[in-house]
Amino acid sequence: CHATALFTDQRYRNNGILSDFSLDQGRSEVSTLPEDVGKFRVPSLRNVAVTGPYMHNGKFKTLESVLEHYASGVKDSPTLDPLLKQNGQLGVPLTSGEKQALIAFLQTLTDEDFIKDIRFQQ
């Protein structure tokens, strides 16, 4: 999902945040396609350490909570991304060490020069 130089595939995917889509249809609100229910655009991971809260609805305040979701909080639905349901198992199992290493890597994607440039501050 988070590939290429931008660390995104620019696609819409269901990442298992919701299982009830009655209030939030995702991409299908625009496309009207049933296969788009619960799908949201995959964001870039550039500067991800400084862009929380995370997910389309701001559900997670920290990167740690995002990884915990992917490890043990994924909700199943008909449009769930197949990468999150391998061999009938939901989520992406990660050890504590893998989570720490992944967060350390994500922090390296922060462009300190960009975020400190006054021309881009609000």
Language-model features and meaning:
Residues 1-122:
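Periplasmic c-type cytochrome electron-transfer domains
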